[in-house]
C-alpha cells in the first residue's frame, strides 16, 4: 500500500438536506477527527472500535464552541473504501455546519481532496482496478435501472476477471515462444507456431464477444442521443412532451415557436434515451430562428438516432426533401404524424418510397397513438433481442478502443506466423495486445491518463 497524506472532502451534494457527510482518509484521519470531537460525557474517539459509530459534537479548536451534533463512523484500513483508515462525519445537512466542519478538519492537518481522489487511492492501493474505479462514476451517473446494474457488474470486477483471464493466456503464449527461441529445434518451431495461431484465434473470438456488445454498452452508459427533426409545426415539441409525459416544450399553432434546443432523458425499457427537440428546419430571415436552425443541424450531426417527422395533413415539399437529404447517412425513424386529421398522405408518393428506413410509423402525437410502436422501433434499431442485466457488457469507449487495438495486434501476430517469419517477432505483437488490454484495468496505462480519468469524478468520491 502506498503512503499518502490525509485528505478530507464533503461526500454529499451541497445544499439543505437531512444530513451531510464529510469523508476523511489517511493514516492521520483518526487523530485529526479526535482532536475536534467531543463525545457525550466527554468521551473521545481513542477507544472507538472499527466499523462502529460514535455520537458527539464537533468543536471549534480555538473558541471551544460547538459547531454541530454529529455521528462519527470509523473504518480501519485496509478494510475500507480507500484501503486506508477512513472516517465519515454525519452532521446536519446545511451548508454552514458542513463548511465549518470541513474547515476545522483542514486546520487540524487534513488536505482538501481533489475530485475523485478517494477512488483514486482505492485504485493505487490495489483495492480495485481502473475499470472498477470507472464503474463507480457510472453508478453515480446511471439514468436507468439497467444502466445501473451494468455498472454494478463492472464494479464487482466481472470485466476485470475476463480481461485478466485473456491477458494470462497471452503471457503463457509469450512464455512458450521464448522457450522455443531459447531451445530451437527445427520441428518444434513449426508445431509451436501452429499451436499459437489456434490459441490466438480463440483469444480473438473472446475479444470479439466483448466488442460486439460494446455499442449497446456505450448506449447504456451514455444514453441514446435521439434528435427530433422536421419542418416547423409538424409536432416535434408535442412529441417531446408526450414522451416525457410533461409540458416541457411550448406548443402553439405558430410555426417557429421552438427556437432553441430542448433536451430531456426518458427510459425506454431500461435504455437511457436523451430526446432532443430542435427548431424546425426551414429557410428563415428571423435572426434568432436562423441560429436555432443551425443548432438543429449541429445536433443532427451528433445524434445516434434521428426521428424525422412529416405532417400527414400536408403534401411533401422541398423543405422535407432537404431535411431528408441532410439525415440520409444517419439511423432514422420516420413518423407520419397528425393521423387524427384523416388526411392520409399518399404512401405511393415517390418520396415515401425513397425513404431508406424500415421504420415508418403513422402517429397521432395529440392522441398518444403510435408512441409505443416508436419506442419498440428505437429499441430494435440498437439492441438485438432482450437486454439482460446479467450479461457482461463493455460500456466504456476507452475500453472498446483498447479491445480493438488488442485484437488488431493479435491479427498481426497471426499474419507474422503465417509468413513464416521468425517466431519471436510474433511475440512483439502479442505483448502489444497484452499491453492494450492492461490499459482497461490500469496495469499498463500512463499516469497522466489515469489522472485525467479521476479528475472527471466529483469531490468526495
Swiss-Prot record:
| GO terms under biological process | tRNA methylation; tRNA wobble uridine modification
From the Swiss-Prot or TrEMBL record, state where the protein is found.
Cytoplasm
Q: Which PROSITE patterns match?
A: G_TRME
Keyword Metal-binding annotated: yes
| Pfam families, per database record | MMR_HSR1, MnmE_helical, TrmE_N
Binding of GTP, residues: 233-238, 252-258, 277-280
InterPro entries hit by this protein: G_TrmE (IPR031168), GTP-bd (IPR006073), GTP-bd_TrmE_N (IPR018948), GTPase_MnmE (IPR004520), MnmE_dom2 (IPR027368), MnmE_helical (IPR025867), P-loop_NTPase (IPR027417), Small_GTP-bd (IPR005225)
- From the Swiss-Prot or TrEMBL record, give the protein name: tRNA modification GTPase MnmE
| UniProt superkingdom | Bacteria
Cofactors: K(+)
The residues listed in the UniProt record as binding Mg(2+), with positions renumbered to this chain, are: 237, 258
Annotated EC:
3.6.-.-
Entry's family note: Belongs to the TRAFAC class TrmE-Era-EngA-EngB-Septin-like GTPase superfamily. TrmE GTPase family.
According to the UniProt record, one GO cellular component term is: cytosol
Keyword Nucleus set for record: no
Q: Which organism is it from?
A: Clostridium botulinum (strain Langeland / NCTC 10281 / Type F)
Q: What is its main location?
A: cytoplasm
Domain TrmE-type G, residue spans:
223-383
Functionally, this protein is described as follows: Exhibits a very high intrinsic GTPase hydrolysis rate. Involved in the addition of a carboxymethylaminomethyl (cmnm) group at the wobble position (U34) of certain tRNAs, forming tRNA-cmnm(5)s(2)U34.
Entry's cofactor comment: Binds 1 potassium ion per subunit.
Task: State the UniProt keywords alphabetically.
Answer: Cytoplasm, GTP-binding, Hydrolase, Magnesium, Metal-binding, Nucleotide-binding, Potassium, tRNA processing
Amino acid at each position: 500500500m502506498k503512503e499518502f497524506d490525509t485528505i478530507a472532502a464533503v461526500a454529499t451534494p451541497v445544499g439543505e438536506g437531512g444530513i451531510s457527510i464529510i469523508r476523511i482518509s489517511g493514516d492521520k484521519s483518526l487523530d485529526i477527527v479526535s482532536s475536534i470531537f467531543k463525545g457525550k460525557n466527554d468521551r473521545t474517539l481513542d477507544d472507538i472500535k472499527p466499523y462502529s459509530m460514535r455520537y458527539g459534537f464537533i468543536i471549534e479548536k480555538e473558541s471551544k464552541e460547538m459547531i454541530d451534533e454529529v455521528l462519527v463512523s470509523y473504518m480501519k484500513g485496509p478494510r475500507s473504501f480507500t484501503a486506508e483508515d477512513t472516517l465519515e462525519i454525519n452532521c446536519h445537512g446545511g451548508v454552514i455546519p458542513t463548511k465549518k466542519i470541513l474547515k476545522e478538519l483542514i486546520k487540524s492537518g487534513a488536505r482538501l481532496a481533489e475530485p475523485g481522489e478517494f477512488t483514486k487511492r482505492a485504485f493505487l492501493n490495489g483495492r480495485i482496478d481502473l475499470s472498477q474505479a470507472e464503474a463507480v462514476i457510472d453508478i453515480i451517473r446511471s439514468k436507468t435501472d439497467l444502466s445501473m446494474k451494468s455498472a454494478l457488474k463492472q464494479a464487482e470486477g466481472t470485466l476485470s476477471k475476463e480481461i485478466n483471464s485473456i491477458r494470462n493466456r497471452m503471457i503463457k503464449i509469450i512464455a512458450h515462444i521464448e522457450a522455443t527461441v531459447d531451445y530451437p529445434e527445427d520441428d518444434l518451431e513449426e508445431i509451436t507456431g501452429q499451436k499459437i495461431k489456434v490459441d490466438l484465434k480463440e483469444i480473438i473470438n473472446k475479444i470479439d464477444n466483448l466488442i460486439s456488445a460494446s455499442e449497446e454498452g456505450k448506449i447504456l452508459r451514455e444514453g441514446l442521443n435521439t434528435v427530433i427533426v422536421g419542418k416547423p409545426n409538424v409536432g416535434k415539441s408535442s412529441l417531446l412532451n408526450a414522451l416525457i409525459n410533461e409540458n416541457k416544450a411550448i406548443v402553439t399553432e405558430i410555426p417557429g415557436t421552438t427556437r432553441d434546443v430542448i433536451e430531456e432523458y426518458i427510459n425506454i425499457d431500461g435504455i437511457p434515451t436523451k430526446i432532443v427537440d430542435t427548431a424546425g428546419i426551414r429557410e428563415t430571415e428571423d435572426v434568432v430562428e436562423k441560429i436555432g436552425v443551425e443548432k438543429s443541424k449541429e445536433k443532427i450531426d451528433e445524434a445516434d438516432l434521428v426521428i424525422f417527422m412529416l405532417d400527414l395533413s400536408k403534401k411533401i415539399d422541398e423543405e422535407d426533401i432537404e431535411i431528408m437529404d441532410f439525415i440520409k447517412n444517419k439511423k432514422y425513424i420516420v413518423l407520419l404524424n397528425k393521423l387524427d386529421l384523416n388526411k392520409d398522405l399518399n404512401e405511393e408518393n415517390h418520396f415515401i418510397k425513397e425513404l431508406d428506413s424500415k421504420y415508418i410509423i403513422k402517429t397521432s402525437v395529440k392522441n398518444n397513438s403510435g408512441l409505443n410502436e416508436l419506442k419498440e422501433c428505437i429499441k430494435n434499431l440498437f439492441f438485438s433481442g432482450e437486454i439482460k442485466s446479467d450479461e457482461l457488457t463493455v460500456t466504456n469507449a476507452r475500453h472498446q478502443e483498447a479491445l480493438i487495438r488488442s485484437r488488431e495486434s493479435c491479427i498481426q501476430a497471426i499474419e507474422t506466423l503465417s509468413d513464416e517469419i521468425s517466431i519471436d517477432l510474433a511475440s512483439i505483437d502479442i505483448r502489444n495486445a497484452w499491453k492494450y488490454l492492461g490499459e482497461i484495468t490500469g496495469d499498463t496505462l500512463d499516469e497522466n491518463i489515469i489522472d485525467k480519468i479521476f479528475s472527471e469524478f466529483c469531490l468526495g468520491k
